[in-house]
From Swiss-Prot:
Residues modified as Phosphoserine: 103
Taxonomy, superkingdom: Eukaryota
SH2 domain span: 393-488
Bias (Low complexity) ranges: 168-184
Expression tissues: Expressed in heart, brain, lung and skeletal muscle.
InterPro entries, alphabetized: SH2, SH2_dom_sf, SH2_domain_adapters, SHE_SH2
Region described as Disordered: 46-193, 214-236, 260-332, 347-384
Protein name per its UniProtKB record: SH2 domain-containing adapter protein E
Gene giving rise to this polypeptide: She
Keyword tags: Phosphoprotein, SH2 domain
Amino acid composition bias (Basic and acidic residues), ranges on this chain: 149-158, 214-227, 268-285, 306-332, 349-361, 373-383
CDD domains given in the database record: SH2_SHE (cd10391)
Length: 492
C-alpha cells in the first residue's frame, strides 16, 4: 500500500522525478535539460536490473524509487533519495517502473517547449498513474510513439505541425519508426497524390513555357479558339490559306486572283483574243501603247492582256493628251527608238519619216519651233560657194535680243549669222553655249577679208568662215571645245 504524500511535501513522486527536479534547478535552461535528458535514457536501467546485484540488503542508490513514504520537507534532497532507495530495497521492485519512464519522456518534452496537446497528455498520464495497469501503460506508450511517427512524416513533407520540436523527439521517432504501421500513413499519402493531380499547369503563351512544361492537345486547341490577331504559327497560316483556296473566299482580291489563275473555256479565250486583236489594231492606228496599258513583261496568254486593255479609263494618260508617249511616263530603256525620234524632231529636224505610231497624232506644240530648226543633222555641211544672202542661217538685220530669243529653244552649239549693230564690224555670229548666248564679231581687214581674231586664219567670205569653224574648234577662251554644229534657219 502506498501512502499519500504529506501536506507541504514536494510533488516529486519517484526517483526519476526527484532527479529531474534537481537537474532542472542546476542546469541553465530548458535546452540544456533537453540535451542532458537526450543521453540519459541510454544509461538508465530498469528497476529489476538494479535490484539483481544488490538484492534486498544491497547498497542504497540515488536513483531508486520509493513505494510508499514520501520524503519529509525538513531533510535535503540527497538524504531523501537515500531513504527512498533503502525503502525500495526492502520492499522490492515496484510495479510502475515503465510508467515512470513514460512520465519522464513527457516531462522532457514539456521542458523542450512542445505543444499544449503533448503537455496535456503528459499531465493526464501523471495524474492517472495510481489507477493504470500494465496493459494501459503499454497502450499509452504505443500511442505516443505513433504520434511521434506522424510528426516525422509531416516534417518530411515540409508541413511540420510542431514548430518548436527538439532533437529528442526526432531521435525517438527515428528509433521507433521501424515499429510503426503503414496503415496510419496511407490516407495522408493518398491526399498528397490527389492534390498533385489537381495542380495542373496551364500555359497560354508559347514564349512563357518553362523547359519542362508538358503541353497537351487540349491546351493548344484552347489557344486556337481565341480571336485571330494576325499573328500565328507558319503551319497554322498555311492551313488557313489552303482552306481559303479550297472553299473560296469572299474577298474580291482573292476572287480576282482565282479568276486570273484558273482555267477558262476555249470559246471565251477565242472571243477575248479577237477583241484584243481589234483593240490593238485601233491603238496602233490612233496612238502608241502607253506605259500603263501594256505591262513591262510580255504575258504568256492573251487573257490577261485583254482584261487590261478592256479598261482604257484606268490608264494614267488622258485620251486628249497630244504629247507623244515617248516624251513622258516611260522609262529610257523602253521605246528607245521613239524617244530618239521625238528628240530628233524637236531639236535636229531629222529627215527620217515619223513612225507608224506618230502618223495620226498632230504635233501642235512643235509648229512654233519648226521655222527656227534646221533640216539637217549634226555637223551640217555648209556650202562655201553659196552667196551669204542665200544661206539659210543668215538672218540679216536683227537685234541682239531677237537673236538670243531665236537661239533659246535650240540645243547647245546652235548658231546664226546677223548684221552687227556696232560700227567696228559688219557681221556677227550668235552662238548658244551652256552658259547662255555669246556674240562673236567677225572682223574685216583692209583688203576686204574676214577673220575672227589676229591669230586665226583669214577668209574671203563669211560662208567660208562658217564652213571652216563647223569642223574646227573656235579660238576663244571658254569656247575651245565648241564648233558651229546646228545652224538655225531664218523665218520665212
Amino acid at each position: 500500500m502506498r501512502r499519500p504524500p504529506a501536506p507541504g511535501a514536494p510533488r516529486c513522486l519517484s526517483w526519476a522525478s526527484s532527479l529531474f527536479c534537481s537537474a532542472a534547478s542546476t542546469l541553465p535552461g530548458p535546452l540544456m535539460a533537453a540535451k542532458w535528458f537526450k543521453e540519459f535514457p541510454l544509461t538508465l536501467k530498469t528497476a529489476s536490473e538494479r535490484a539483481r546485484p544488490g538484492g534486498a540488503g544491497g547498497k542504497p542508490r540515488k536513483n531508486s524509487e520509493t513505494g510508499g513514504a514520501a520524503p519529509t520537507p525538513g531533510k535535503g534532497r540527497k538524504n531523501s533519495a537515500a531513504e527512498l532507495g533503502a525503502s525500495k530495497a526492502s520492499s522490492g521492485p515496484p510495479k510502475d517502473s515503465r510508467l515512470s519512464r513514460d512520465s519522464l519522456q513527457g516531462l522532457i518534452q514539456a521542458a523542450a517547449g512542445k505543444g499544449r496537446k503533448n503537455s496535456r497528455v503528459t499531465a493526464t498520464a501523471t495524474e492517472e498513474e495510481p489507477h493504470r495497469g500494465a496493459v494501459t501503460k503499454s497502450a499509452g506508450c504505443s500511442t505516443y510513439i505513433s504520434r511521434l511517427i506522424k510528426v516525422d512524416t509531416q516534417e518530411k513533407n515540409g508541413k511540420s505541425a510542431y514548430p518548436g520540436g527538439g532533437s529528442t523527439s526526432s531521435s525517438s521517432s527515428s528509433s521507433s519508426s521501424a515499429s510503426s504501421s503503414p496503415s496510419s500513413l496511407g490516407p495522408e499519402l493518398d491526399k498528397a497524390k490527389i492534390m498533385r493531380q489537381q495542380d495542373t499547369v496551364i500555359i497560354l503563351e508559347d514564349y512563357a513555357d518553362p523547359y519542362d512544361a508538358k503541353r497537351t492537345k487540349g491546351q493548344r486547341d484552347a489557344e486556337r479558339v481565341g480571336e485571330n490577331d494576325g499573328y500565328m504559327e507558319p503551319y497554322d497560316a498555311q492551313q488557313m490559306i489552303t482552306e481559303i483556296r479550297r472553299r473560296g473566299s469572299k474577298d474580291p482580291l482573292v476572287k480576282a486572283l482565282q479568276l486570273l489563275d484558273g482555267p477558262s473555256e476555249p470559246g471565251e479565250t477565242v472571243k477575248v483574243e479577237a477583241t484584243a486583236k481589234r483593240r490593238s489594231s485601233k491603238d496602233l492606228l490612233g496612238k502608241p501603247p502607253q506605259l500603263y496599258d501594256t505591262p513591262y513583261e510580255p504575258s504568256e496568254g492573251g487573257q490577261r492582256v485583254a482584261e487590261v486593255k478592256t479598261r482604257p479609263a484606268d490608264s494614267r494618260l488622258p485620251e486628249e493628251d497630244d504629247r507623244p508617249a515617248a516624251e513622258y511616263e516611260q522609262p529610257w530603256e523602253w521605246k528607245r527608238e521613239q524617244i530618239a525620234r521625238a528628240l530628233s524632231v524637236q531639236f535636229e529636224g531629222s529627215d527620217r519619216p515619223p513612225g507608224r505610231e506618230d502618223a495620226g497624232r498632230p504635233h501642235h506644240w512643235q509648229k512654233t519651233l519648226k521655222p527656227t530648226l534646221s533640216d539637217h543633222g549634226d555637223g551640217e555641211k555648209v556650202d562655201p560657194g553659196l552667196a551669204l544672202e542665200k544661206q539659210p542661217w543668215y538672218h540679216g538685220s536683227i537685234s541682239r535680243a531677237e537673236a538670243e530669243s531665236r537661239l533659246q529653244p535650240c540645243k547647245e552649239a546652235a548658231y546664226l549669222v546677223r548684221n552687227s549693230e556696232s560700227g567696228n564690224s559688219k557681221y556677227s555670229i550668235a552662238l548658244k553655249t551652256s552658259q547662255g548666248c555669246v556674240h562673236i564679231i567677225v572682223a574685216q581687214t583692209k583688203d576686204n577679208k574676214y577673220t575672227l581674231n589676229q591669230t586665226s586664219a583669214v577668209f574671203d567670205s563669211i560662208p567660208e568662215v562658217v564652213h571652216y569653224y563647223s569642223n574646227a574648234k573656235l579660238p576663244f577662251k571658254g569656247a575651245e571645245h565648241m564648233t558651229l554644229l546646228h545652224p538655225v534657219h531664218k523665218l520665212h
